[in-house]
Amino acid sequence: MKTLKILILTSIFIAYGVFITFHWVNFKAKGLTYDAIDKIPKNNVGLVLGASKHASNGNINLFYKHRVDAAAALYKAGKIKYILVSGDNSRKDYDEPTDFKNDLIAKGIPTEHIFLDYTGFRTLDSMVRAKEIFGQNAFTVISQRFHNQRAIYIAQHYDIDAIAFNAKDVYKTPPREYLARTKARLDLLFNVGPKFLGDKIAIK
């Protein structure tokens, strides 16, 4: 009985921590995410957070598609000058950054204005590498709102002056975002850094 009570109390404590963290991230990002292109301030670089081009059923992943559309729209509106795509390229047959680049070029974005980060395995890696490798202390994050909020929360920890543009969403906040935010909080608490850093790359 005592063990059951401990398990119940522990579960309640964990659930409460997850709940508080989720809403704390929302609070920290308040006023820093934008839905309208005409309202968002200009930045030199827009950071597109990676996603798989295809969903598990083989169809185009709408999270991916809407991020491509958002990045192209910001560029064409003069809100960003360069696009940095950060994503996963951990396998030979899987290359998020190149997929984004090809589709951005198809939308009329000049190839010389697109830069790729092949080791953006997770949001923390993408944000920190944008600063440490690509030399960007201020930039516009491009993803869906729930993802942008977490990215800005991470950015603030690393003294990055980030704002975000909310690409069209597919559905309300995915349940796994509650866990993703908790993991992000723990990563920051225990000072977990990117998997890889490396040589500096200038965006110009």
Task: Cite the ranges covered by each PLM segment.
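N-terminal type II signal-anchor transmembrane helix
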Residues: M1-D38
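Enrichment for repetitive, rod-forming helical segments
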Residues: I12, L74, L188-V192
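Short, Lys/Arg-enriched, disordered terminal segments
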Residues: M1-I8, K79, I201-K204
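A transmembrane-helix-recognition feature enriched in membrane-embedded lipid enzymes
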Residues: P174-G193
